Amino acid sequence: MDRPNDAPTSADAPTIDASDSHAVLTLFGAICDRTTTILAANDDWSASGERDGQYSVDVEIDTACLDMLHGAGFAVLSEESGWSGPNDDHSPTHLVVVDPLDGSTNATLGLPWCATALCLVSNGVPTVAMVANLRTGTRYTAVLGGGARRNG
């Protein structure tokens, strides 16, 4: 499968202010909305052929995450596809670590324990995070210095 690992350069990409936790959580929420939609519509549980234990839906959801994160100007470290980001800078100030479909085997079995997990790391420090259960809709968020919340 073709994947959009070539991110736009930072000069070309629209950006989200990484210091604005509300804007980052809004982006993460939109990503989780998209991954939920993809999983709900999925009927292809075939292997991706890219890695052992990776399903085609893992790749599809990863691609959606990369598109949205790169579009916001972020470098990404994905559990599914590894590093991608503007200018091949492997030491960016801001990096989003993502597991696009954590629990994909649970998802194949129809079990309600699968999630998209995202975390913004700024200058090596985790600052904003979201974990969204893709079957139940429950979302957990955390902001450095602001605590953690469930569905709020």
Regions found by a protein language model. Name each.
Residues 82-84, 137, 147:
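Surface-exposed, flexible loop/turn segments at secondary-structure boundaries
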Residues 149-152:
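Short, intrinsically disordered, charge-balanced linker/junction segments flanking boundaries
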Residues 1-98:
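N-terminal subdomain of lithium-sensitive/metallo-dependent phosphomonoesterases centered on the IMPase/IPPase/PAP
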Residues 90-145:
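DPxDG-like acidic metal-binding loop motif
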